[in-house]
């Protein structure tokens, strides 16, 4: 029986991060193997802001999610920032338990011209936000989608979940492009919608519990990217998501993910709960950043049951020099040692 390797901290890295003490060989994430051609780098798309959304982490996450699988499935879809910024997979599934979010994406896919026209005619107005925040069960699906987008894009926080009548994002002195900064951002968000319409044409949508979707679409050719609500111990606010998860629900999710045939990647803040649930999976850490909800530092991490360092799985992406990530390989992998290439 081999004796465990005794590691010692080597101090901060050149970008200020502390190296990780780990049970396997300590290494830097090899970004050179993942640098793609300049023509492969795509402009980033975003439909709306979302608490816990991964738009700001695209440079970190996309190189770690293999593009070789036949099916890409997001059980916790949220703003779909990961899905719409990936190259299309042969089969793609988006799921979210919030029917307002799924209704918006379905409407913009199936009624894109009409919805974009209505949104473009919507003034940047406090009254529009007030109207959008008041539920009316008799609304059409398209009008529901328009009001959802208004809530998401005209609120002060810029997050769909935290919109309210008193949070209209008006400006006093800030200007941009010859107009109030908030108005400019609103118009810019509308201009970006046609690209998103085109990208969503090939996506199938679900509005169901995440575990139900995982079991339904599990196969050896499926890559699940799971971005569940951050555990409560890793953040300061307790009601940031429309649908929260308890620690027990996180445990149930981990039990299911450990039993699937497919490859799995799980996003989250590092905390004792996540480290315990995915202790024998590979973990990659992003640079430490400030967490607004707790006014402290939080480390965004990705846990995988496959080896994300394999260059054949992540061709076409590049890591920028400013994003150097820590890579931790445990002594043993989880239920799956390497992602299998779909046939």
What would you call each of these model-derived segments?
Residues 150, 302-305:
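Short, well-ordered beta-strand micro-motif
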Residues 76-81, 192, 268-272:
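Short, polar loop motifs at secondary-structure junctions
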Residues 28-57, 67, 109-239, 252-255, ...:
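SAM-dependent nucleic-acid methyltransferase catalytic core
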Residues 1-39:
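Short Pro-Cys-Gly-centered "Cys-loop" motif that presents a nucleophilic cysteine in a tight turn
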Residues 308-342:
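Flexible, glycine-/basic-rich loop-and-beta segments that form/coincide
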Residues 63, 68-135:
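SAM cofactor-binding core of SAM-dependent methyltransferases
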Residues 220-302:
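Conserved acidic-Pro-Pro-aromatic motif
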């Amino acid at each position: 029986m081999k004796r465990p390797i005794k590691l010692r901290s080597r101090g901060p890295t050149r970008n200020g991060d502390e190296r990780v003490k780990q049970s396997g060989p300590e290494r830097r994430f090899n970004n050179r193997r993942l640098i793609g051609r300049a023509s492969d780098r795509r402009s980033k798309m975003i439909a709306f802001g979302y608490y816990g959304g991964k738009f700001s982490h695209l440079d970190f996450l996309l190189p770690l999610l293999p593009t070789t699988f036949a099916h890409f499935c997001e059980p916790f879809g949220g703003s779909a920032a990961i899905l719409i910024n990936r190259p299309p997979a042969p089969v793609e599934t988006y799921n979210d338990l919030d029917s307002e979010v799924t209704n918006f994406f379905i409407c913009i896919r199936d009624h894109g011209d009409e919805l974009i026209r209505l949104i473009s005619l919507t003034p940047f107005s406090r009254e529009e936000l007030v109207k959008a925040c008041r539920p009316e069960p008799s609304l059409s699906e398209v009008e529901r989608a328009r009001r959802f987008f208004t809530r998401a894009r005209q609120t002060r926080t810029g997050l769909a979940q935290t919109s309210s009548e008193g949070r209209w994002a008006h400006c006093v002195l800030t200007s941009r492009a010859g107009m109030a900064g908030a108005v400019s951002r609103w118009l810019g968000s509308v201009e970006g919608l046609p690209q998103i319409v085109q990208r969503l044409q090939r996506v199938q949508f679900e509005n169901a519990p995440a575990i139900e979707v995982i079991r339904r679409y599990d196969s050896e050719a499926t890559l699940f990217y799971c971005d569940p609500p951050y555990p409560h111990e890793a953040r300061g606010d307790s009601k940031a998501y429309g649908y929260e998860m308890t620690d027990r629900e996180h445990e149930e999710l981990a039990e299911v993910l450990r039993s699937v045939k497919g490859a799995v990647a799980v996003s989250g803040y590092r905390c004792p709960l996540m480290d315990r649930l995915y202790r024998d999976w590979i973990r990659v850490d992003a640079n430490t950043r400030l967490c607004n909800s707790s006014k402290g530092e939080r480390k965004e991490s990705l846990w995988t049951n496959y080896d994300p360092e394999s260059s054949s799985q992540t061709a076409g992406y590049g890591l920028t020099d400013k994003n150097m990530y820590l890579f931790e390989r445990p002594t043993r992998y989880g239920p799956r040692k390497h992602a299998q290439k779909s046939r």
